[in-house]
Amino acid sequence: MLKISPLSDLTKNEFEALFSSYYQELGCEDDIAHLINEYILPDLLAGLINIEILQDGDTYAGFVIYQTDDINNEWNFKEGWGDIRELYIIPSHRRQGLGKFLLYTAEMKLKESGVNKSYCLPSEESEKFFIACGYERTEGYNAELDSIVYEKHDLSNKCK
């Protein structure tokens, strides 16, 4: 059975393992424990970001990190927009619709909070996924992350 729930003390260790796998897959050499303990968890506790973790039976299979861009947040690229910051599904669970399920969950929670539009800064490998979910490539570019901006103007628009 699939279950998506907000990150909690009970799932912190599983999230750390998933995030570590995600960063290794991206080829990042950052200190993952430092990132989680000094940036991610404090931002979560301050209400600046949201994290949902996906469980498939006994397996923790992925997560999504998202936020509403706000002037009070250190990362405020598009004021008032939803930002799908990170989305990860473990390799053994890919191509089963779980990424779309996580993305749709984040979008609906953003919509419930009054956000009507979202964007993402996908890697080249994930661009097709976001396009299939209704995001459109823009002329926007984020130099810090070396990424093209993709936008979705209707969060009622489900993934294909």
Where are the model-predicted features located?
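Active-site rim helix/loop that mediates acceptor-substrate recognition in acyltransferases
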Residues: C28-I53
